[in-house]
């Protein structure tokens, strides 16, 4: 530690300059590391939604104890005798509403299929319509007549392995601009019709289809942790070295005073390792050791105790009939 003090004190100016330069550089690196980077990423965002609805009902055409003749009813199932005609409406638009042209082609088909594989299919009714922004297509279907067409075709075919059915097919083509962006899409919708021997029913439709568009978003990305830890550590070390250099420069204005302090501490440490005694006047062989560290190590390795003669200023020990000594430096 004392040698460290001496080095820092002797090289006060270089240590201070290097510490300050390192401090500024590491502080800048730390500041730069705390600023997140930005990058562009491609994402998809909602552009608009296509909305399609179908619902309807039937007018009662016959006196009965349930509904008044001429009333309009909406039921899960309908009777051929009471409600032979079904009135339905298909509605289409977009959200948000766009500056678009909408074209619809609608047809009512009846068919026969085996294991979901079509055998034959016939068109009962077809219509087309054009509008802007939104569109409504109305249907008025004589389901009693439709049932007769199905039975007639099936009887003509003469095979009854599969099943018969009917549906409404609607193709919607729209083009133009929505929220200022060009669109051109064609969508298809199928509305099943359940035609049974004693009743029929229509499915409803309430469908939303979302459309997305690509967008660029700028996101923040944090820099790796080591890019913050290393500059922070360098900042800390630089501050410590700069502070120590100033403290040692202030405390030890004269380098010689620090050197004397180091020598004093070193001397006190040496004295703690030895015992005091007079070096004997003897005819033993004598070996002089140059450094205290060497004689201290030799005494330790030979398991001998090291002594110090204050009057002569000599460290010594005896081993194997030989007196080893080291003069005080």
From Swiss-Prot:
Membrane topology recorded in Swiss-Prot or TrEMBL: Multi-pass membrane protein
Please tell me where this protein is predominantly located: membrane
Where is this protein found?
A: Cell membrane
What domain of life? Archaea
The record's InterPro entries line, in alphabetical order, gives: DUF5305
Q: List the disulfide bonds.
A: none
Name used for this protein in its record: Uncharacterized protein AF_1654
- List the lineage, top down: Archaea, Methanobacteriati, Methanobacteriota, Archaeoglobi, Archaeoglobales
């Amino acid at each position: 530690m004392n040698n460290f003090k001496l080095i820092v004190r002797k090289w006060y100016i270089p240590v201070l300059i290097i510490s300050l330069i390192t401090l500024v550089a590491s502080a800048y690196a730390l500041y730069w590391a705390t600023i997140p980077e930005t990058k562009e990423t491609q994402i998809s965002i909602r552009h608009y939604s296509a909305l399609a609805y179908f619902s309807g009902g039937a007018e009662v055409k016959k006196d009965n104890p349930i509904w008044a003749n001429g009333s309009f009813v909406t039921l899960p199932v309908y009777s051929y005798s009471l409600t032979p005609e079904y009135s339905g409406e298909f509605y289409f638009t977009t959200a948000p509403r766009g500056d678009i042209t909408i074209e619809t082609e609608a047809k009512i088909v009846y068919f026969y299929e085996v294991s979901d594989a079509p055998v034959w299919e016939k068109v009962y009714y077809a219509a087309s319509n054009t509008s802007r922004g939104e569109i409504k297509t109305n249907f008025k279907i004589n389901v009693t007549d439709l049932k007769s067409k199905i039975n007639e075709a099936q009887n003509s075919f003469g095979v009854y392995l599969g099943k018969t059915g009917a549906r409404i097919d609607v193709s919607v083509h729209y083009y133009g601009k929505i929220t200022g962006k060009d669109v051109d899409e064609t969508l298809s919708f199928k509305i099943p019709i359940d035609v049974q021997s004693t009743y029929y029913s229509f499915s409803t439709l309430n469908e939303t289809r979302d459309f997305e568009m690509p967008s660029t978003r700028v996101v923040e990305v944090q820099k790796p942790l080591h890019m913050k830890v290393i500059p922070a550590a360098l900042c800390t070390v630089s501050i410590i070295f700069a502070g120590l250099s100033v403290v040692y420069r202030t405390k030890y204005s004269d380098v010689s005073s620090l050197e004397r302090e180091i020598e004093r501490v070193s001397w006190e440490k040496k004295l703690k390792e030895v015992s005091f005694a007079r070096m004997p006047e003897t005819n033993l062989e004598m070996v002089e050791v140059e450094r205290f560290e060497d004689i201290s190590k030799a005494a330790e390795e030979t398991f001998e105790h090291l002594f110090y003669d204050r009057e002569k200023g000599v460290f010594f020990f005896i081993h194997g009939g030989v007196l080893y000594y080291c003069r005080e430096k």
